[in-house]
């Protein structure tokens, strides 16, 4: 469950390390984002010479959450951190690599490029 003011790790190689959620882009009045939801975020920590700088406002898709995700078969999955991948306006990843596992729910939401770049899909 990601809400405004939540800090997330960045799971790609765009140069950002931490982002802070500003807005959840899901419906008109959504309070929380979960895996596969798009958020608007501000870059709070970045490495020098990266594709994004501190203070940039970016769109990102949530790929891991500490709050468990319940699946239709009754199982649940949760991760050790909250993480996102920075995307462009066409919902394609801006980076060329994705670090760490991502949830299977991304495939159902149409983020196939992120799923194919990820080393592991859980």
Curated annotation (Swiss-Prot):
One of its GO terms (cellular component) is cytosolic large ribosomal subunit. One of its GO terms (molecular function) is structural constituent of ribosome. Keywords: Ribonucleoprotein, Ribosomal protein, RNA-binding, rRNA-binding. GO terms for biological process: translation. Transmembrane segments: none annotated. The keyword Amino-acid biosynthesis does not apply. This protein binds directly to 23S ribosomal RNA. Contacts the 16S rRNA of the 30S subunit in two different positions helping to form bridges B5 and B8. Belongs to the universal ribosomal protein uL14 family. Part of the 50S ribosomal subunit. Contacts protein L19. Forms a bridge to the 30S subunit in the 70S ribosome, contacting the 16S rRNA. This is Large ribosomal subunit protein uL14. It comes from Thermus thermophilus (strain ATCC 27634 / DSM 579 / HB8).
């Amino acid at each position: 469950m990601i809400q405004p003011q939540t800090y997330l790790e960045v799971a790609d190689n765009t140069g950002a390390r931490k982002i802070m959620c500003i807005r959840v882009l899901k419906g008109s009045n959504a309070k929380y984002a979960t895996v596969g939801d798009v958020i608007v975020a501000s870059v709070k920590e970045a490495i020098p010479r990266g594709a994004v700088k501190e203070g940039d406002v970016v769109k990102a898709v949530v790929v891991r959450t500490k709050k468990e995700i319940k699946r239709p078969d009754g199982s649940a999955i949760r991760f050790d951190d909250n993480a996102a991948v920075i995307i462009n306006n066409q919902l394609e990843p801006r980076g060329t690599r994705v670090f760490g596992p991502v949830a299977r729910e991304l495939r159902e939401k149409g983020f196939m490029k992120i799923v194919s770049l990820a080393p592991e899909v859980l």
